[in-house]
Amino acid sequence: MTMKLLVAEDARDVAEVVAFGVRLTWPDSEVTVATSGQEALRQFDEQKPDLVVLDVSMPPPDGFEVCRRIRETSSVPILMLTVHDSTADKVRALELGADDYLTKPFDHLELLARLKALLRRAGGALPMGGRQYTVGDLTLDAGTREVRLRGEAVKLTSTEYRLLEELVRHAGSALPHQYLLERVWGPEYVGDPSYLKVFVRRLRQKLGDDAERPRYIQTEWGV
């Protein structure tokens, strides 16, 4: 598989570990390393990578700001790295648009597993055939992976799309959070509901869905 990866990491040893693992797993891959936020944004614009590994603590702008700016124009999968194992940092990264989050130091096999999961989510939809689904004024086309709200296209990341797709496929049903985590993220994420909470908030924001009076996504506590 040919893949273009951008690694934004100011610690050379960490960047080399990531690059080595990627090249070993995907021999034809092109890996670009940036050591500052400014360089990361420039390389992103020039290289148009398929995947971004982004360190939180870099020379300015930091990883959070780089993630925010990338999300203004792109839905590319983003994995963020940090030395801080805090829920607040994790939630902030996900709310800014990151798809996943990994704490340093990390096992390179776990890193590769997460990158594979990101590429898998980005590369294909859940098995729904080519059907078109409509919920109120929301339309999801499973064949083209297009989502429209009142006729206007809604730009979603691959993970946001897969979550919405699963919800639409079971419209009217209450789905356990463990089921959604396994279906959208994978079995290794079942014990971490923070992913689901943040991505539901992201979907609601993009759909203009009021959490107090939801039209599309309702939360049943305890499910």
What are these regions (language model features)?
Residues A11-T32:
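Two-component/phosphorelay signaling modules centered on CheY-like receiver
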Residues V33-L51:
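Acidic, metal-coordinating helix/loop segments flanking the phosphotransfer/catalytic sites
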Residues G130, K155, V198-V200, R204-V223:
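DNA-binding patch around the recognition helix
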Residues K4, A117-A174, Q178:
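Short, Lys/Arg-enriched segments at the junction into DNA-binding effector domains
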Residues R68, E72, P77-T134:
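Basic, amphipathic DNA-recognition helix from helix-turn-helix-like DNA-binding domains
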Residues T35, M58-P61, A88:
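Hydrophobic residue at a beta-alpha junction
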Residues V52, V56-P59, H84:
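The short loop immediately C-terminal to the conserved phospho-acceptor aspartate in CheY-like receiver
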